Amino acid sequence: MKTELLIITALESELKREALPSGVEIVYTGIGKINAAIISIKAIHQYSPKRILNFGTVGKINPQLHGLLEIGKVIQRDMDAEPLAPRGSTPFCIRPQEYLSTGQFLCGSGDSFVTAQDPWLLSKDVD
């Protein structure tokens, strides 16, 4: 089955299927990057989408931000694989520019919650 648009989100509470127009498919991955990767690959194979929209709820560092934001770049905020790559970078990822969108905001993705100030995140202008 082919679809024009596939929306990937973690939880049904983030975006209800009923809110979508016909012809748009949505998959719920559950929480976590491993779940998201597995379910996303299965959905891509099942629906062969022309476009994929990753939709979700995130925290924020910048108190001025509200609403729906278009992310332009993502860094792995809790990835520290030095000396193989600098903090925030995934080692051996040779084409990170291919994963960017036209949005203006920087998302710091991670496998943990940010519970304290991190000067590194502020220095990288993570939103």
Spans of model-derived segments:
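Glycine-rich phosphate- or other oxyanion-binding loops that anchor nucleotides, phosphorylated ligands
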Residues: L15-D127
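Short polar catalytic/cofactor-binding loops
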Residues: T9-E14
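Extreme N-terminal starter segment of soluble prokaryotic enzymes
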Residues: M1-L6, V24
